[in-house]
């Protein structure tokens, strides 16, 4: 197998590592049965608090970044870098370790973007964060961040491979948040800081 194929597989496996599930398990909690059932940092925050949530967020961000670093070490093309970034996100969303279920891919998307294009990532982050702080809806901030990253990639004149990668990541974010969109419309979406009982 070529280096490109191996790197794509490694990126998927990196992304598949379910940090939220593993961290919650150390507290005797099955994260998939708590709150939203999501394996990401937001649900960890609801169930276990800020400390464990920050650990999960850090891991989910940097597993995407590690995938990009490995791809660069192999000297892969720009388009392959984009493919590796997407595979890491798909691994998080559809983890082989969780029977192809997983999270929403926001932190991992940010991590890949941070290592692909730090300037774009650091322009995008405060936009998404501002929406979260203003509304206390993490889902709204996540989707806004996805749109902002795509718009900024166009505005900043980024190359086609990067624009395409960011566009597909934004689409994935909206796809994984489709139930959140429904709850936002219905007014039943949980806000940041709302706790749930950890079982």
Curated annotation (Swiss-Prot):
One GO cellular component term: plasma membrane
Disulphides: none
Pathway(s) this gene product operates in, as recorded in its UniProt entry: Lipid metabolism; phospholipid metabolism
Catalysed conversion reaction: an acyl phosphate + sn-glycerol 3-phosphate = a 1-acyl-sn-glycero-3-phosphate + phosphate
InterPro entries: G3P_acylTferase_PlsY (IPR003811)
Listed transmembrane segments: 3-23, 50-70, 78-98, 113-133, 154-174
One Pfam family, short name: G3P_acyltransf
Top-level EC class: transferase
EC number per UniProt: 2.3.1.275
Topology of the protein relative to the lipid bilayer: Multi-pass membrane protein
Oligomer status and interactors: Probably interacts with PlsX.
Record PANTHER family: GLYCEROL-3-PHOSPHATE ACYLTRANSFERASE-RELATED (PTHR30309:SF0), INNER MEMBRANE PROTEIN YGIH (PTHR30309)
Family membership noted in the UniProt record: Belongs to the PlsY family.
Matching HAMAP family: PlsY (MF_01043)
Name of the protein this chain belongs to: Glycerol-3-phosphate acyltransferase
